[in-house]
Amino acid sequence: MKTAIIQLPGLNRDRDMVAALHHITGVEPLKIWQTESTIPDVDVIVIPGGFSYGDYLRCGAIGARTPVLQAVREKAQKGVTVIGICNGFQILLEAGLLPGTLMRNTSLKFVCREIKLEVVNVNTKFSRYYSKGQIICCPVAHHDGNYFVDSETLKQMEENEQIIFRYAENTNPNGSVNDIAGIINKAGNILGMMPHPENFIEPAHGGTDGRLFFQSALELAKG
């Protein structure tokens, strides 16, 4: 199992992601810097959270236009699994690899707390080890996590079962349409989500609900 983590100036959750991937696979992930125009053969590419390029212009706007993101695009088109968490999700949206956009939280405040998620679709490589309707706990930490998409695209996403996670039990922290917390592309190999499953891997960190997410994605990619 080979994994790679994209590194951009301002991304600050890469060490958390390294720890999570190493915990699941037992192998240290490759670290790919922003200026790289090619990515070695890997099974999974992860874009972690943070504030790439200081969130100038828009969150993820500059990061989406780096050489390494073009390399990510090429890998994704070949079916490689791509995961974007928080700012990584914002970058994938800016790059056009996922539908929709992320706006300022409706509270206009940075939100950092644990929230509840409902697992909506378990027929994906990212959620197959969960149970449909399962409620899991996961932390969030963002200022611009309010997911929005036009009504026609939203209808298509619902029909295509592209929504994997929803905020549950009235814990929507940002005002996202239809409580959407995590989505995939039509092909099912690209995922973006605002919550941080990498922070809930070990009991000492407060929970283990994120472990099944990585086991689902990494073991299926390997297979």
UniProtKB/Swiss-Prot annotation:
Superkingdom, natural source: Bacteria
Q: Which reaction equation describes what this protein catalyses?
A: N(2)-formyl-N(1)-(5-phospho-beta-D-ribosyl)glycinamide + L-glutamine + ATP + H2O = 2-formamido-N(1)-(5-O-phospho-beta-D-ribosyl)acetamidine + L-glutamate + ADP + phosphate + H(+); L-glutamine + H2O = L-glutamate + NH4(+)
| Any one GO CC term of the record | cytoplasm
UniProt subcellular location:
Cytoplasm
Key words, A-Z:
ATP-binding, Cytoplasm, Glutamine amidotransferase, Hydrolase, Ligase, Nucleotide-binding, Purine biosynthesis
Classify the main location: cytoplasm
Record-annotated active site: C86 (nucleophile), H196, E198
PANTHER family recorded for this chain? PHOSPHORIBOSYLFORMYLGLYCINAMIDINE SYNTHASE SUBUNIT PURQ
Subunit relationships:
Part of the FGAM synthase complex composed of 1 PurL, 1 PurQ and 2 PurS subunits.
Function, please? Answer: Part of the phosphoribosylformylglycinamidine synthase complex involved in the purines biosynthetic pathway. Catalyzes the ATP-dependent conversion of formylglycinamide ribonucleotide (FGAR) and glutamine to yield formylglycinamidine ribonucleotide (FGAM) and glutamate. The FGAM synthase complex is composed of three subunits. PurQ produces an ammonia molecule by converting glutamine to glutamate. PurL transfers the ammonia molecule to FGAR to form FGAM in an ATP-dependent manner.
Protein's name in the database: Phosphoribosylformylglycinamidine synthase subunit PurQ
Species for this entry: Bartonella henselae (strain ATCC 49882 / DSM 28221 / CCUG 30454 / Houston 1) (Rochalimaea henselae)
* UniProt gene name: purQ
